[in-house]
Amino acid sequence: PTPCVIIHYPEETINLLPKAIGVKCEQVVCWVYNSNTGKQSRLISWWGCKPDFRKVRQPYKNLNDKRIQKRIAEGKTGAKIYDWWNINQVKNVSKEKTEHPCQIPEEVIGKIIKTTAEENQTIIDVFAGSGTTSKVAYDLGYDTISYEVDKKYCDIINKRIYERGK
């Protein structure tokens, strides 16, 4: 399979990367969240691959709509996800919170993996941080390789991977 690169920070890469390496951005999603700071969104970009939003379903919004009722009766589980994701940040009181200062929510990483990865692919995270990508990849049945230079964060990653099996 063709390598796929997904970048969620910083947003400037969407403008700089095509000029630097000659690859175009295939898809951009806006992840929005409530925050006490001025910044309340991040762009997530796909390079060298295009996500398939049909792989992930979201609940239907208007359950009284006859068309929606018909789809539900046919066994459909929801609409494909949009390119605008409203998902809360990981906060200090979040169940998934670790000691890492800028942790990405499991739901965001899960949507990225589910819409992009093919069966039997290995998920690689070269800035592993809190280990969310590896944890979610394992939870979804994928093998994963993580790289992190800070030993403190390596310990967090190892703990999360070990504890997920309990």
Label the predicted regions.
Residues 1-147, 151-154:
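Core catalytic lobe of class I
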Residues 162-166:
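Class I S-adenosyl-L-methionine-dependent methyltransferase module
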Residues 157-158:
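Conserved SAM-binding loop
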